Every structure is written in C-alpha cells, then in structure tokens.
Amino acid sequence: MAKGGEALPQGSPAPVQDPHLIKVTVKTPKDKEDFSVTDTCTIQQLKEEISQRFKAHPDQLVLIFAGKILKDPDSLAQCGVRDGLTVHLVIKRQHRAMGNECPAASVPTQGPSPGSLPQPSSIYPADGPPAFSLGLLTGLSRLGLAYRGFPDQPSSLMRQHVSVPEFVTQLIDDPFIPGLLSNTGLVRQLVLDNPHMQQLIQHNPEIGHILNNPEIMRQTLEFLRNPAMMQEMIRSQDRVLSNLESIPGGYNVLCTMYTDIMDPMLNAVQEQFGGNPFATATTDNATTTTSQPSRMENCDPLPNPWTSTHGGSGSRQGRQDGDQDAPDIRNRFPNFLGIIRLYDYLQQLHENPQSLGTYLQGTASALSQSQEPPPSVNRVPPSSPSSQEPGSGQPLPEESVAIKGRSSCPAFLRYPTENSTGQGGDQDGAGKSSTGHSTNLPDLVSGLGDSANRVPFAPLSFSPTAAIPGIPEPPWLPSPAYPRSLRPDGMNPAPQLQDEIQPQLPLLMHLQAAMANPRALQALRQIEQGLQVLATEAPRLLLWFMPCLAGTGSVAGGIESREDPLMSEDPLPNPPPEVFPALDSAELGFLSPPFLHMLQDLVSTNPQQLQPEAHFQVQLEQLRSMGFLNREANLQALIATGGDVDAAVEKLRQS
C-alpha cells in the first residue's frame, strides 16, 4: 500500500473499499457458534469454516435463513444475512454405498501418537465423510448409533446398559458384535467421531493415549462382556480415590482430576446418563465451567455415586446383584406407564410367582366364609392375624393370617395398617403409605386406589356389642380409628370389595399360571411395549378402541348391587346417611378386565401425551425458529421422522 503523500503509480487500479466484517451466529438444535466473516463471503466458504468447528464435511451442512436453504454460490449479502443475525445449521446424515464397508480390514493398526488429536484430513478423506460409521453396518441401524453426538435414542440404550446387564451380555454375545469390536481401530475412530470426545482429547492428552492403546481397548471390551467384573472394578477404583484424600497431597490430585478430567467427561455425556453422579447438591445450581477450584481442605466426604436418589439409605440393604429398584424400571417408560404400574407388578410376580397363589387362596377362603349365613346378633369378623377363626375354633390358614403384612400381596387388595389412620394401633411394618400400600409395590389397577381412599379401608368390625358400655370388644379386633358407635353401616367396604374382587378372581388365577411361563410373561411385556409405541406413533388409532372399552365398562358397571352378606339382620339404629359420592363412569371402569382398563387409562388419564402437538412441542418450536411457519406440515414431517428435526428439515425441503 502506498504511503501517505505518495502518488499511486500510473496504470494501477483505483483502490477498492475493504469488505465489511460481520458477525454471524450459526445455531444447531444443541449448540451455537459465532463466526466473523466478510459480507462478500460465499455460503461455500462459510460452510468450510463451519465444518472445522463442528467436525463435519461441508457437503453434510445445510444453512437455513428466513425459511430458505442458502445456496453455495451466493454471498451473505445476496442472501440478506447482516451483522448479528442467526443462521440455522442442519447436519445431514451420511449416505454412502455399501461397497465402502469392504476396506474395513485395511485400517492401520498403529494409530497416531499418544495424546495427538487427529487432523480433519485423517477423519474426513477427500472422497467424502468417514469410511466407518455404525449407521452403515447391517444389524446396528436399529440402535440409532448413526446419529452424531449420541442423541436421545442411544441414551435410552445406555440407561438399559446400566440397569439391565443381561441386555449387554446378549448384545455382546451376538456373532456380529465381536467381529465389529475386535477391530480396535474402528472402535477408536467411532469414538473420535464424537465432537465432545474431540474437545476432551484436545484438553486432556492422556485420554488420547488411552484410545490409541489397543491393549486398553481390548480390556475395556472384555469388561463389557462381564458386567459384574466391570461394576466391581469401578467400585474398587472409587474406594481408592476416596482413600487418596487422606494421603499428603492427595487432595490437590483429586481436585485436578475431577476438575480437568472427570467433570468434563461426565458433563459431555450428561444428557445420555442423566447427570453427573459425582456432583454434590450444593453445586447443582453453580456453573462448574467458570468457577475456580477451591484450594481449601475438603471437610466433607465425597458423595457416594452408588446411592439411590429415589429412596433412603436403607433401601439398598439386602439387595442382590440382579435386583432393580422400581423407580429405575419406571424411568425407562413414559409417564402413563407409571399410572398403570403393570410392568412393575408383572416384574414382582415373575420374581415370586407363588405370592399370587397364596394370596388368592386366602382371599377365596375369606370370601367363602363371608357368604355363609351370619349370626343373628354379631356380624362375622373379617380375617385377622389370629391363630383361630372366631366362632368356629378352627385354625385359620397361615396364608390368610399373614396376608395383611405380606409385602408380596397385591397392593390394590391389601388392607392398611393402623398407623395409616394417624392414631394408635399395631403396626405391621414400615414403608406403608396412607392407603396401606407398600411404597415400593405399585397397583395393578389404579382405579381401585380411588375407591379405597374414599373410606378407611381396614378390616373393621361393626359389631353392635362394641358400642355397649361394659362389654369388652373381642381380642381379635384392631384398634379403632374413631369410636365404633359413630361409624355408619354404609361405610362398611367389605361388600364393595367382594363385588370388585370376585369378577377378577378367574383372571388373576390365569395370570398366576402365566407368570410361571416365561414365554407368556414375555408376551405380556411385548403387549405393553406395543401399547406404548401405539400411543406414541399412532394415538388416533388407540383412540379407536374407546367404543369397545366404553361398552365393556357399561356392561361391567351395570352389575346390580347385591345385599351385603356381612350385614346384620338388626342394623344399627338411625344410621347416618352414606357419605359416598356418586360413582361415575371412570370409577365403574375398574370392574372391567385390567388389561382393557389399561387401554382406557392410556386414552383417558393423560390424553395430552397422546396428542402429537404436545409430544413434538419442542421440535415444532425449533422448526418455527428456522423459518418453517406451516405448523401442520411441520407436524406431519415430525410424525413421519419420529421427532428427528434434521430428518424433518430434509423432508420439508423435498416437499
């Protein structure tokens, strides 16, 4: 450039004004980056800069601005992109022919130097994207591992890996998987394709050394084959790290390790594993990325990552290796399955199939005794934990005696203990809720819980002799929740309980027989999983079952109320009016078979989850922010692609 005061040489062109530098924000559904480019920059040049940040080939990038796809030859000024505006980025999937999978055996066995970060040229060759991707391998496409950055579908697979070790064992034993995992170079390249791992290796070279060591990769794959060994190794390592704090200088080593290695690694996969188990409650609301590590001595012990967050410390006592907590099972299904509680109940019946038969025998004996003609003065007392049957002197079955406090008894048919009423009385055990359910045992039919909460659902006696002063109550009666003389006849729940149980006894007997058959149990689980998929993918088809359910409910609800066999011939004088509200159609629905009622719950209890608009609300907002304003077209595209925003954008482009 000519200095000030000097004339330009003759024949030289006139000075051209420098292009204006602008700042463009590139936003993806999960990330956002800022780029400083000139306004004359073409879209192709911008894609090349974006590909270096997002580790993707420029041909995979699609830039969207104001609802339009930006073309490569156009400049930013021609597209109307000005300083401070946002351009949306969509990374397309990798589509290649199956013939590119053949050179898998030609992967070099020696990787880069330890700690070195592979260059973009080594990750993306000149002829296209990487030659290896799980999305191209036959048999693994259903696992969803072709998505970049491990989206939500593999996260559910990882949660199953933690909670169901048998699933991983079956997956590893598949003949195709060992051949895939035996190629350590392929596994290393698959891991390096993750942008989070790229950034982690850049800041921590020792992780790159681990990935470049084939022996460590082989040992890791062997641990995957044996989940018990892997869990024991992790527990032993945690004990060593906990003892490291007591060694002089060990606290500084722990601070460095957790700040520089553990926290970035766990935060990188936080969406997949549900959070950082090493983060304490005091640091949940703090920003760990900007805060400096404290140089003070740690006075608090490190948190135990193996402690369950759903229950107390005593919930893990006596737990075996193959056991699972009920909240862990419920987290793998949508919220409406938490209302039905069918999977939990089938799981418990599978673990102890004899419990249902024992309970049904005690229930059948109690019902047969209740149908006998009662005495003229006193009502027949219900079965209670006593050694003899009142009035007959015959010993009661041990099953019916212990059924009140048995944890394996179905919760929707169990009587509550006296501590649930808030007053004195014998306690059958801890962990009972207000309706007498065990807190870790779900209901089979949720409708019975509503009817059980209307009245004190306990084996109460309504003997008129108990209200006469000077006459003591029989010893087998429990402590009353309130004076028996004030208790109306209409509050006796025994007749209603009989009407509810008797139509379901044949079904429960068949259910017990099915629990002993592994194939039948697997079929029941497949039915539930099919209903889950149907409620998500085709909610309107599930609504089609409503006329059938309504007809079944009306037939079951039309059962005439019979006379109470437990009622005395001489009722109490001047009984107060009944306090029951009128039974509506929803409450009469529990008289229908449980599996039909499960379908009814899917439609009626939480209809918002069955609406596609509510299910894809977040994805619809993302598409609207990208400029796609046709909500109906966006919804149809999301339904067709299963909620994948990138695939929905491609479908909208083609339409």
Swiss-Prot record:
Biased composition (Polar residues): 432-441
Residue ranges with Basic and acidic residues bias: 318-330
Annotated spans, Disordered: 102-124, 277-330, 364-399, 412-447
The STI1 domain, residue ranges: 194-233
Tissue expression per record: Testis specific.
GO CC term (a single one): cytosol
GO function terms (MF aspect): polyubiquitin modification-dependent protein binding
Name of the gene this protein is made from: UBQLN3
Gene3D superfamilies: 1.10.260.100, DNA helicase RuvA subunit, C-terminal domain, Phosphatidylinositol 3-kinase Catalytic Subunit, Chain A, domain 1
Recorded superkingdom: Eukaryota
InterPro entries: STI1_HS-bd, UBA, UBA-like_sf, Ubiquilin, Ubiquitin-like_dom, Ubiquitin-like_domsf
GO biological process: cellular response to stress; regulation of proteasomal protein catabolic process; ubiquitin-dependent protein catabolic process
The organism of origin for this protein: Homo sapiens
Name this polypeptide is given: Ubiquilin-3
CDD domains: UBA_PLICs, Ubl_PLICs
Stretches assigned to the Ubiquitin-like domain: 22-98
Record field: compositional bias (Low complexity): 110-122, 279-290, 377-395
Boundaries of every UBA domain copy: 609-655
